[in-house]
Amino acid sequence: MVKQTINFLSNTFPKIYSSLYLKYLKQYSEIHNIKKTELKALVFLKGNEKINMTELCSKLNIEKGSLTSLIDNLSKKGYVCRKKTIKDRREYIIVLTEQGNEIAIDFIEKLSTNLEKKFKKLNKKDRNNYLVAIKVLEKLSDI
């Protein structure tokens, strides 16, 4: 089981991630003149409001210096803003602006349409197996 898991993580998972997400992320970012990492951040922020820089670094798996530059760029473009927290005035949370929210929603809607087309090519049994596999992987990630 361990050997298959390592093979899955090193070979199969990157293919799945690329096929279902990264290829479309790249296409969308090129068309809309936004960097892939910026778009990933907007989509992540859409689903995780009120997150601080430290948490965002961890979730996006990037260094704090890189994240600071990323947030600076998104802020200049009008996609995010920094807000001081009530608990600690030295700490900021990153919040989507209306424009950033619109981009995230547009990307998610277009990605959803793209994924629906792919999933329609699977038979019902394979779609159900796919959903079960996702649930098992989510459980495993929480252990």
Question: Residue ranges of each PLM-predicted region?
Answer:
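C-terminal regulatory/oligomerization modules of transcriptional regulators
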Residues: 1-4, 23, 125-143
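Short amphipathic alpha-helical/adjacent loop interface patches that line ligand
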Residues: 13, 38, 60, 64, ...
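N-terminal helix-turn-helix DNA-binding core of bacterial DNA-binding proteins
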Residues: 22-63
